[in-house]
Each structure stands twice: as structure tokens, then as C-alpha cells.
């Protein structure tokens, strides 16, 4: 969010210099931290540890579906990589407008996170997650067809809001369902998929925009997200009643 506003009001050069200065400051502060010692624990090979994480995930139902749903929605539904094209060629709002577009999803996510502290989506968590991802796809389609800045900002803010709901539910599921000795392994597997899907999603968006155009590429991404939600809805109806608050108490 701050990056978008910095780009809008300070320009590209000042924003990049500010980021470099802040990163350098973080590096210095980390090096000033005192060293800590930890008790020795039995270590495993990385591949062996990841393999155990994959095996545990395969034994459950809600965990692999949660990871897969997020993976596909980010891989196909993300539009962040295409925002410069929309700002320049479609909305014609220039660098300042691009900053607003970049900030909109973060603003939507921030407002939603604050609301979730009062109204957590824990009852019928899986159904809520599917609805949130479906909303992400629908608002992606709305952004693709928007010719107005205010409507584009609203659509992007709502994608951030829906994504934040999905993230909260998914992260809670990944913390509650694995036993204590498997949480790190499951988190590592999830982190591997999340980090790779973000980069591959940007590549997919750029490749699709090159051959289909930015609007059709965004429509394709939103449609694929809705298709995955429909498939998940049909295959996981038995999970609709899941209450992750009760699972946490157990």
C-alpha cells in the first residue's frame, strides 16, 4: 500500500531510493541483534522432511484443497503484473494512477483484516473460503472490463478484501489440522507453492497479455479462478460445515 502511494506522489526514482535505504537499515539492525543459542535437535534431510510434509497433506482432505485453491487462483487470477498496461493503455492515468492501482488491493485487505478481528470467518470456514475466492475471480472480471478509474479501484480493493479472507482461513487451517511435529513441514510445503505461484502467475499474466491482450488475459484468469471454485464446490461439499474454531479447541 505504501509503495503504491510512494510511486504516485514521490515518483519512481525517489521511491526506489527510499526502498534501498530502508532495506539497508533493516540489514544493519538485523546484524546488531545478539546471537541466541538453541538446544540441539535431531535433524533430517531437507528432502526427507518435505516428503513427510507431502505425505501428511495427502492423508487429509481440507489441507490439500486449501493449498490447491490458493495456488490456482494466484497462478491465473492475479492482475498485479498487468497494472502498468492498464494504467497506460486502457485507463490512461499515467504513473500517478498506477500508484493508486497498486495501493487499492492493500487498502481493501487492510480494512477487511480489521473487520475480521470482530467477525472471524471461522464457522463454515471452507464454504467461506470458496465464496471469498469466487469473489476474487468476479472482481477480477469487473476490473478487466472497467473503463473508469473509480470502478477499477473498487474492483482491485475488493480483490484484496477477498484474498485476505482466503488467506486468513487457509493459514488457520494449516496451523490447526497438522499435529505439532508436522506444522513446520506443512508450512514449508505451503510456502514453496505460494512463493512459486506468485512468480509463475506474473509470468502467465505477461505471456497471456502478449498473445491475447491485457483485457482477455485478465478475463481468462478470472474465469479460471471461478472454474476452480466450481470444481472445488462440487468435490468438497462434505467440508462446508467445518468450524475451525471447534477444531482449534480440540
Locate predicted features:
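Alpha-helical transmembrane-bundle signature of multi-pass membrane transport and export proteins
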Residues: 1-250
Amino acid at each position: 500500500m505504501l509503495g503504491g502511494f510512494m510511486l504516485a506522489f514521490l515518483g519512481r526514482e525517489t521511491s526506489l531510493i527510499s526502498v534501498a535505504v530502508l532495506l539497508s537499515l533493516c540489514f544493519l539492525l538485523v546484524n546488531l541483534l545478539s546471537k541466541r543459542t538453541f538446544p540441539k535437535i535431531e535433524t533430517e534431510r531437507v528432502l526427507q522432511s518435505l516428503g513427510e510434509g507431502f505425505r501428511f497433506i495427502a492423508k487429509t482432505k481440507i489441507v490439500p484443497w486449501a493449498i490447491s485453491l490458493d495456488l490456482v487462483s494466484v497462478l491465473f487470477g492475479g492482475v498485479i503484473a498487468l497494472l502498468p498496461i492498464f494504467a497506460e493503455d486502457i485507463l490512461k492515468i499515467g504513473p500517478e494512477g498506477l500508484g493508486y492501482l497498486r495501493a487499492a488491493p492493500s487498502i481493501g485487505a487492510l480494512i477487511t483484516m480489521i473487520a475480521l478481528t470482530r467477525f472471524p470467518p471461522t464457522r463454515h470456514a471452507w464454504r467461506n473460503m470458496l465464496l471469498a475466492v469466487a469473489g476474487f475471480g468476479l472482481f477480477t472480471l469487473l476490473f478487466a472490463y472497467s473503463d473508469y478509474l473509480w470502478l477499477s479501484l473498487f474492483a482491485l480493493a475488493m480483490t484484496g478484501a477477498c484474498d485476505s479472507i482466503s488467506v486468513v482461513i487457509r493459514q488457520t487451517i494449516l496451523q490447526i489440522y497438522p499435529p505439532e511435529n508436522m506444522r513446520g513441514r506443512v508450512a514449508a510445503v505451503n510456502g514453496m507453492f505460494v512463493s512459486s505461484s506468485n512468480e509463475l502467475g506474473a509470468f502467465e499474466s505477461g505471456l497471456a497479455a502478449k498473445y491475447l491482450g491485457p483485457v482477455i488475459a485478465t478475463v481468462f484468469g478470472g474465469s479460471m479462478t471461478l472454474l476452480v471454485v466450481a470444481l472445488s464446490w462440487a468435490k468438497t461439499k462434505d467440508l462446508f460445515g467445518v468450524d475451525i474454531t471447534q477444531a482449534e479447541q480440540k
